[in-house]
């Protein structure tokens, strides 16, 4: 198979694509892969590091308000469509897969015009503007949240979950749990100021509880709190770090997650059957993180603390109410396991094969 994958800007569009490619390499080792992104997006760094060939087009996002910049965006869109067609005529893909982000717009659009089989993967519960635009033009639509199905034509939409779920589930298969109940608190790669402030407030209480806390402040914040953190460095209940490098292994060993509710994070957490306390970021388009988390609250696998309601007290209470209540913990764990999709890449692969024949 020859496949072009496109998607970028943020990790939520890129990591699922890379997870799928990892699976594809395993089931079809002879697959030829080309990734199309932008020079400015996160993909420009991450994709080559993964050993995948990258080509770029020059495109920018559409402003949601009236702006002269949108004229420039329109010009760049059609120029990128033309550039993408040239790349495809040279590469001759059997299928083109878009995982979201504005770069996927012109690339998948170009593929559809060339009558190349196309599929998009929507990772969030509320679709982004690019995938909403592409929905009528593609052959298949894969979604990572059941809530997203309502926004797309039912005849070509399939729930597959997020490919990161299968990557995490496979990697964690042989990992043993910590002996003591453990919660991982993580505000993302850069950290989250509101979460840090609540954690500092909660430290005296967390130091005395019956569970262990692993906390990552984010590297840019760590030095600001280092003096306070050092006061607790001998406390066996607390493991405080600037960043968590081995997140998959750590989550697999733990019993509970507390943090933001990006689509990839939720896929990883549910693939492992972990209950979760989500604190949706208020700085995300269309309040996507709240919508993402709500689907799993409705299924009994998680609870939400609004960012504005997050304090040291609400943080400790939320964790304690789950980890120190065995019946509730087991109910949430079962719900999380049921909601998880540990075969997400296989499901997406089945769709790809279906349209590339």
Swiss-Prot record:
BP GO terms, sorted: carbohydrate metabolic process; cell division; cell wall organization; lipid glycosylation; peptidoglycan biosynthetic process; regulation of cell shape
Membrane is among the record's keywords: yes
EC number: 2.4.1.227
InterPro entries per UniProt: GlcNAc_MurG, Glyco_trans_28_C, GlycoTrans_28_N
Record's keyword annotation contains Cell division: yes
Cellular localisation: Cell membrane
Any single Pfam family the record assigns to this protein: Glyco_transf_28
Primary role: Cell wall formation. Catalyzes the transfer of a GlcNAc subunit on undecaprenyl-pyrophosphoryl-MurNAc-pentapeptide (lipid intermediate I) to form undecaprenyl-pyrophosphoryl-MurNAc-(pentapeptide)GlcNAc (lipid intermediate II).
Main location group: membrane
A single Gene Ontology CC term: plasma membrane
Tree of life domain: Bacteria
Family according to the record: Belongs to the glycosyltransferase 28 family. MurG subfamily.
Name of the molecule in the record: UDP-N-acetylglucosamine--N-acetylmuramyl-(pentapeptide) pyrophosphoryl-undecaprenol N-acetylglucosamine transferase
Lineage: Bacteria, Bacillati, Bacillota, Bacilli, Lactobacillales
Pathways involved: Cell wall biogenesis; peptidoglycan biosynthesis
A GO MF term: undecaprenyldiphospho-muramoylpentapeptide beta-N-acetylglucosaminyltransferase activity
Gene3D superfamilies named among the record's database cross-references: Glycogen Phosphorylase B
Membrane topology: Peripheral membrane protein
Residues engaged in binding UDP-N-acetyl-alpha-D-glucosamine: 10-12, 124, 189, 244, 289
Entry keywords, A to Z: Cell cycle, Cell division, Cell membrane, Cell shape, Cell wall biogenesis/degradation, Glycosyltransferase, Membrane, Peptidoglycan synthesis, Transferase
């Amino acid at each position: 198979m020859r496949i072009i994958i496109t998607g970028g800007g943020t990790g939520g569009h890129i990591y699922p694509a890379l997870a799928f490619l990892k699976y594809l390499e395993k089931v079809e080792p002879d697959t030829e892969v080309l990734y199309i992104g932008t020079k400015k997006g996160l993909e420009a760094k991450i994709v080559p590091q993964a050993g995948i060939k990258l080509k770029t087009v020059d495109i920018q996002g559409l402003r949601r308000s009236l702006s002269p910049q949108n004229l420039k965006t329109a010009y760049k869109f059609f120029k990128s469509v033309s550039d993408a067609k040239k790349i495809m005529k040279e590469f001759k893909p059997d299928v083109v897969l878009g995982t979201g982000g504005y770069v996927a717009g012109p690339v998948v659009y170009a593929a559809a015009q060339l009558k190349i089989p196309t599929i998009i993967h929507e990772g969030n519960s509320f679709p982004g503007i690019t995938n909403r635009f592409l929905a009528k033009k593609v052959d298949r639509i894969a979604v990572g949240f059941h809530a997203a199905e309502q926004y797309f034509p039912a005849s070509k939409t399939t729930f597959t979950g997020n490919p990161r779920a299968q990557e995490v589930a496979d990697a964690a298969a042989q990992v043993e749990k910590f002996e003591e109940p453990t919660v991982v608190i993580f505000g993302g790669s850069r950290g989250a100021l509101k979460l840090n402030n609540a954690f500092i407030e909660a430290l005296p209480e967390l130091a005395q509880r019956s569970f262990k806390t692993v906390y990552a402040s984010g590297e840019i914040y760590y030095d600001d709190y280092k003096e306070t953190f050092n006061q607790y460095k001998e406390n066996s209940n607390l493991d405080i770090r600037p960043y968590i490098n081995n997140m998959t292994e750590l989550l697999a060993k733990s019993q509970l997650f507390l943090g933001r509710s990006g689509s990839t994070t939720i896929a990883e957490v549910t693939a492992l059957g972990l209950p979760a306390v989500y604190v949706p970021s208020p700085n995300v388009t269309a309040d996507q993180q709240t919508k993402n988390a709500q689907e799993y609250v409705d299924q009994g696998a998680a609870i939400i603390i609004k960012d504005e309601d997050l304090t040291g007290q609400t943080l400790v209470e939320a964790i304690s109410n789950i980890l120190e209540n065995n019946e509730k913990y087991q109910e949430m764990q079962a719900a999380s396991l049921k909601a998880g999709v540990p075969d997400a890449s296989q499901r997406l692969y089945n769709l790809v094969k279906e349209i590339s024949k």
